[in-house]
Structure formats: structure tokens, C-alpha cells
């Protein structure tokens, strides 16, 4: 997802190329902006009031990653901005359901993208070939062709 975001925001890609200390912010902003797991199901353990509707205990509830684009939480939520003031997100969950692999995923993303920038500081995307992977859980690319400069 970051490769595509950087192709669409080359100025921010250049900022990271020049200042690698921006990696942590970049990875988290990408996870906020393009969550890999846009929805998750949970069972309600007790009756829950949600917008004047009671969700009974035992019900399944589907939660969406739209929280990452909530305008009450983020200024310009539909804008990719690695210098955003508050880049917290719910892509890895929260509380007891927080992803155990979150730190490893961040590290893998940083290492892969760091190497990509080292080898090819400029690139674009072949938009005609884009194809999301057909899965019901994790969001990612089946095909994302990068055009190297």
C-alpha cells in the first residue's frame, strides 16, 4: 500500500528518501490511510447501546476501518499526510484484541520500503494493471505493477 501511496504522493516519498527518520510516521499513516484489514467481527458480551439501537449480548458485530477516516478525529482524513499530528489508528485493533504481530509488520514494512527507496528513489504505478486480491479478510494487491524511473 505504501508503494502506491508514494507513487501518488511523490513529494512525501522524496521527504522520506531525504529523511529516513520519517519511516515510523510513514508506515503508521499508510496503515491509517489504507488499512490492510478494513473490517473485523466481534461478539457482543453484554447488551450494547449504539446510536439508539440495542445490540443484544451474543450478537455478532462487524466493525469497519472507517474509524481511520473519522473527521472528528483527523483533520483532512481522506488526505495521505506523513506529517499528520495524530497518526494513531485502529488497523491493528485496540486493547486485548491488539495484533501481536504489529511491531513485526511495521518493521517488515520499514525494511522493505527502505530498500525500495535505496534502489529506486522514483517510481510510478501502472494503473491499468491494478487488481485487488479477492479475499474477504485482508486487503492487498493481487497485481500492482510498479514503473521504475
Predicted feature descriptions by range:
Residues 1-149:
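Cytochrome P450
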Amino acid at each position: 500500500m505504501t508503494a502506491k501511496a508514494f507513487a501518488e504522493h511523490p513529494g512525501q516519498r522524496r521527504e522520506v528518501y531525504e529523511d529516513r527518520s520519517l519511516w515510523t510516521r510513514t508506515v503508521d499513516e499508510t496503515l491509517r490511510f489504507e488499512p490492510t484489514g478494513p473490517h473485523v467481527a466481534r461478539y457482543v458480551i453484554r447488551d450494547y447501546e449504539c446510536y439508539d439501537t440495542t445490540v443484544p449480548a451474543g450478537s455478532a458485530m462487524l466493525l469497519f476501518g472507517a474509524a481511520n477516516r473519522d473527521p472528528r478525529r483527523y483533520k483532512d482524513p481522506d488526505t495521505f499526510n506523513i506529517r499528520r499530528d495524530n497518526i494513531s489508528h485502529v488497523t491493528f485493533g485496540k486493547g486485548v484484541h491488539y495484533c501481536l504481530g504489529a511491531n513485526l509488520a511495521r518493521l517488515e514494512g520499514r525494511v522493505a520500503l527502505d530498500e525500495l527507496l535505496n534502489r529506486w528513489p522514483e517510481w510510478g504505478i501502472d494503473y491499468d494493471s491494478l487488481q485487488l486480491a479477492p479475499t474477504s479478510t485482508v486487503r492487498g494487491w493481487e497485481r500492482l505493477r510498479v514503473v521504475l524511473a
